[in-house]
């Protein structure tokens, strides 16, 4: 990038606000939700036909919803970042707080609009996710319990956004939102020590939640339409990727170890979603979802995850 070009620097600053590696994980949420709904994507073995336009609308919607949420997070955090993270786009002056607020609001509105193109049910799910994102950014993230719960509900809602491609299947599969809720709750709770360090108690809580997620992924094998044999390799990959850094952070809750755990946890949302996708739609479809992992890793070399 040409650092002598102010317009390009400004564009780059707004891209940084979007946290592109994280947006890739949001796409994985929706793709997993589509698998849960049994939609007839190519290679998925799905039984419920869904228009490709609706699938594209839901994928675009999650980009808007997640992107809007993380941009507004920086807007609300601007005064704090001026002290703790002055290199971020807003406190450094590379992006204006007003411009970022407008950008984030437009992204959320676009996300809701995109979901509405799929179905009214999808639009309602998108409104829930958008409201949760704003609630988290403005208030909940400062609460030790409320913050992780709200963020987890947003992620769970994002999974259900994919399920809503078949509205009739949303209610019977709604409990699956507990998986991302628990895992993101683990990430969010431990992330509260990113700057000043955390506590072993928080680290142990995060490990307990991760253990519950792993156990639940295997317990889903009790469902007739969930093929545990297909999901198991992805569950193992998820465990290998996320457990070691969280154990290290729990043992020594220093800022750098917590940051490493959070980064690993965010990216591990992809193998988590791949496990769900493989269980409900077969290992080939699960592998397609997992293919987002190197994309997210590559983008994480260019953009911050947290």
Annotated model-derived regions:
Residues 57-62, 78-133, 148-154, 158-160, ...:
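Multi-pass membrane catalytic core of lipid/isoprenoid biosynthesis enzymes
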Residues 1-32:
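N-terminal, positively charged, Ser/Thr/Ala/Gly-biased leader segments
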Residues 26-76, 84-85, 108-116, 120-136, ...:
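Membrane-embedded alpha-helical segments that form the functional core of polytopic membrane enzymes
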Residues 2-10, 156-159, 164-306:
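C-terminal membrane-associated helical module and adjoining short loops/tails
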Residues 34, 38, 74, 92, ...:
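Transmembrane helix-loop junction
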Residues 16-21, 90-100, 117-122, 143-146, ...:
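Short, amphipathic, aromatic/basic-enriched membrane-interface segments that mark the entry/exit
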